Amino acid sequence: MPLSEIDRVVQESARKLLQVSAPPIKYWLMVDTLGMDERDPLVQRTIAECKAYPPRLKLIRTLRKDGTWPISKSRKAAEDAGPGPPVGWTYITMLRNLQLLEDMYTDKGEGFISSALERILSWQKKEGYILGPHHDLFPLPHYNGYAIRNLIIYGMQDDPRVKRLADWLLSIQRHDGGWVIPYQEDVKYLPEYKHMKMQDFMELVRKGDTPKSDSKGFRDVPSCIWTTMMVIRGLARDKEYRRRREILKGADFFLDRFFKANRHEAYYHSEKNWTQFKYPPYFGSGLGALYLLTILGYGPGDERMEKPVRWLLDARHSDGFWWQSDRPHMQKDQWITGFAVDILQRYSKNR
């Protein structure tokens, strides 16, 4: 496709988005997409607007001294009935809100953000991983990818604990370049378990009555598209890791499967997940995949990118915006459009 078409779309949509967007979206659009200098008076004014942005202030205000946010009474009761954090909604809420705050131009020196990051690291095991949030039976690579992303975006990439988490994630990369959810996406496919209900199977895992999950085994089982994407999403936030062959191999894994159904029913089985527009993009989508791929340097020189980029262009509406899939939402549509414009601009620049 002509790169001039992409450049035109970027300029048109960016111009429209600048006119109506919330301060954080405007900031990232000006600095990341349009390359404006932080010292530009317009950028400085936008930063001041970000600092006063009510949703940002609310999240900072409700973050408690211990690094956690309040959760509903029902979720707190369920959490208290189990092993406690990091299992439960406290940890999930921390991960989500930390991402939202960084999106809204927040650094770790504000409020009790440092306490939240330290609390996450306090749950780290000696092997490097963090258990939770769904159970404490085994670590979930996609949530560990989510955790390391938050730690890196707040500038903790050189912390030895963060490096240990990254090393653990890389140590369980599989033969095809991807990752799976242990047990649920490898041992579960053994003949004696494949027809069992997941709940019954997980009870066997809890009792220790199954073979162990093995990232170097089960070579007949392909990795999970979305687990892989979540791990890469975390590690790719660090410039040093972006250059590592393991990261590019993981990116190749999900690029080669763009628009295809995930083999695993445990995590976004349908191919429809590729074409869903949503914000926040927590657990994978075509938009999230393209964002990662362009960050890693994929561009027009890779023919595998052509169909995904064409899909993104074709999904743009006549008003110059991309809309949330389940129902249009003005604020979320602005974020989604910001991501789309940034992806297209970076794709063109990677020529």
Question: Which positions does each model-derived feature cover?
Answer:
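Preference for long, amphipathic alpha-helical scaffolds in soluble/luminal domains
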Residues: 1-351
